[in-house]
């Protein structure tokens, strides 16, 4: 197979940041994706419908003339999120989900949830409104090994949450473990999972062996090879509730290449090429169209994009960096050649 045509894809987990960085990276994502679930972890976080509306307008204002890219907005769940705000979000027409960051789990998560029991009424309202909860599934705390955070979260937080809220739709985002992969490919119709290109392609050796590679560093951190294999099997299985979510997370080069580097891999401009590489390695290229273009809309109750794109087997030279406003952004696989690229008519 030398070409693959699929519905124009959506990204169900995307960071666009704000300010000059957003002005630079939003057009790069819009060139690849039709829609994207936009993460709310700004400073300050997007916690109200009013803030989400303003952020949406800033994103739309950063797009080139004629762009049809649609930002699907989210709210940042806090201990104080009210049921009334959830009702307003569901009625807005542009807020499509609420994001759970456990406090301290990742970039700009300090305002995150400290105890889900404090969010009981908001989560109950989400059940009533059919608004999905998107989860950064890591437990935090000094006693937890960083490589065990996801499995601890599933056992100690996620399962009790699902039991307490039997009608709540949940997306376990950026699944990184075999335990998580098994969970989201189970029989629970409320539960879906997104998979990033880096977690399908790489393990923790790729991050650490032969020198620390800051542009492979993300949260949740890359795991064991056995986990990567389980993720790839799940993502390429054809299961209807697994779909594309890059977690593309731009940081200025200096914030990554430092003594205390930020977590996040920048992949949006090359994401489809990376996913094609992973799916081809699994012998499942024919399943990429559902993963990238159909499963996500089905879970969110949205139409599949009528436009199509075509991947072709031809070298794609990844640039050393992309424009990032005040400072360049270095992508994953910078300076390397990928085997698949989007066909440019």
UniProtKB/Swiss-Prot annotation:
PROSITE patterns from the UniProt entry: DIHYDROOROTASE_1, DIHYDROOROTASE_2
Cofactor note: Binds 2 Zn(2+) ions per subunit.
Transmembrane domains' residue ranges: none
Binding site for Zn(2+) 2: 99, 136, 174
Top-rank taxon, per record: Bacteria
Cofactor: Zn(2+)
Biological function: Catalyzes the reversible cyclization of carbamoyl aspartate to dihydroorotate.
Protein name per its UniProtKB record: Dihydroorotase
Native species: Halorhodospira halophila (strain DSM 244 / SL1)
Gene name as annotated: pyrC
């Amino acid at each position: 197979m030398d070409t693959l045509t699929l519905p124009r894809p959506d990204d169900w987990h995307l960071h666009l940041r704000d300010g000059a960085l957003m002005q630079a990276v939003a057009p790069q994502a819009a060139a690849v994706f039709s829609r994207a679930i936009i993460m709310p972890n700004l400073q300050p976080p997007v916690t109200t419908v009013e803030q989400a509306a303003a952020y949406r307008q800033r994103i739309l204002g950063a797009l080139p003339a004629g762009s049809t890219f649609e930002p699907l907005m989210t709210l940042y769940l806090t201990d104080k999120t009210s049921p009334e705000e959830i009702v307003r979000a569901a009625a807005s027409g542009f807020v499509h989900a609420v994001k759970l960051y456990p406090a301290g789990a990742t970039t700009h998560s300090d305002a995150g949830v400290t105890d889900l029991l404090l969010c009981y009424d908001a989560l109950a309202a989400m059940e009533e409104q059919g608004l999905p909860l998107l989860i950064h599934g890591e437990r935090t705390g000094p006693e937890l090994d960083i490589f065990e955070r996801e499995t601890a979260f599933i056992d100690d937080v996620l399962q009790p949450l699902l039991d307490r809220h039997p009608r709540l739709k949940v997306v376990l985002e950026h699944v990184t473990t075999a335990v998580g992969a098994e969970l989201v490919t189970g029989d629970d119709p409320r539960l879906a999972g997104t998979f990033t290109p880096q977690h399908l392609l790489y393990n923790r050796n790729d991050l650490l062996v032969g020198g620390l590679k800051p542009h492979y560093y993300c949260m949740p951190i890359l795991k064991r090879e056995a986990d990567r294999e389980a993720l790839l099997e799940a993502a390429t299985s054809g299961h209807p509730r697994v779909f594309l979510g890059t977690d593309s997370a731009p940081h200025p080069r200096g914030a990554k290449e430092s003594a205390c580097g930020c977590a996040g891999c920048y992949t949006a401009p090359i994401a489809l090429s990376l996913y094609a590489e992973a799916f081809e390695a699994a012998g499942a290229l024919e399943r990429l169209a559902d993963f990238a273009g159909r499963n996500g809309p089905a879970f969110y109750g949205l139409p599949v994009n009528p436009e199509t794109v075509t991947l072709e087997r031809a070298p794609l030279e990844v640039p050393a960096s992309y424009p990032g406003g005040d400072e360049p952004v270095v992508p994953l696989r910078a300076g390397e050649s990928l085997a698949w690229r989007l066909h440019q008519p």
